[in-house]
Amino acid sequence: MIKKAVVGLSGGVDSSVAAWILKEQGYDVTGLFMKNWHDTTGLLQSDCHWEDDLMFAEMVAKKLQIPFHQVDLSDEYRQRVVEYMFAEYEKGRTPNPDVLCNREIKFDSFAVEARKLGGDFVATGHYCRKDEIKPGNKTIYRLLAGKDHNKDQSYFLCQVSQEQLASALFPIGELTKPEVREIAQKLGLATAQRKDSQGICFVGKVHLPTFLQQKLEAKHGNIVEIVEKETRSVFPDIAEGLPEQTISDESLSQITEPCNFTPSSGHIIGTHNGAHFFTIGQRKGMNIGGHKEALFVIGSDVEENIVYVGEGQSHPGLNRKGLFIRSEDIHWIRRDLRMETGECRDYQVRIRYRQPLQSARMFCRHKGMYIVFDKLQRGIAPGQFAAWYDGDELMGSGVIDR
């Protein structure tokens, strides 16, 4: 029996080629475009809006001679992704809307719409792969990095479940980006040379403070510079390498704790319009001169409305040895291999998209997971996702608490 695959046609080259591949493989293919955002508040003028994406998606469906539908999921997107973003930024955290979009929209709300069209599978243009193993009578799905490690997007799917993976297809996971564009060019697809989308998933490139001011009001506060040579006592002296597996909980807490800056740790050098508009590692948006090197955000206090900065990329305030994830925020894709309380395991971890995998040791405790890296990590930001891998396989992830 021919299986039906509903492809999320986004108007980009990746989903276009994904649809063609599935058709070549014998699937009954339908294209489904989802409209998730109408508001242009904060959008940069040069960015394309959803009308352009819809036009290109329709052109591809016509060229491939597949049925085409569209669905408006903007209410779901606002409630389940955008509202979460606002809430996290208000707490002084830095969310990743792309990860949430995949978990809550593409492989949930969109999948529901795909099933209404008779779809057995939901296909996307993600650069990642899926396979399955069958220990005993049980089927377990594995999420793997894409063949093109420069474009690997498995990180964005770090929160999907076994149930979501069961009906997911990633047709371009074995291809590189140049190969995808070459196929599109040979097929004469209108999307062949279209630029990749950037910025917030389904919203686009935005001026973040303007976008956030839809819900978060501007509040003037101080920017405090932490000068390394004057405050060395603030920065812990942490050795390189992985800690012993028998390390105490107290030591784990100490080496994963961020620096505790106070106004007395430095001096005021300027003002800002709201601490919740800044994230760890940010260097733009402060408009402060008089320094040899760029200033970077190394901390913030949203309650006191203070932003802490340090000069230069080598400032120790940018680097941390580890992080902590609360137990309720830990997600295992491979539930059969989840760690138990008291267990220690070595994985490769990344804390942002396209970051090279980092050697780390993970410690599962009653309150949550401590992740300690072999080398110091730059820009660990609460609210972001840490994802852990065993080789090419993404095992699980969690929201960074501190």
Task: Please name every model-derived segment.
Residues 1-159, 169, 177-180, 185-186, ...:
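ATP-dependent adenylation/nucleotidyltransferase module used to activate substrates
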Residues 123-128, 134-402:
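AMP-forming adenylation/ATP pyrophosphatase catalytic core
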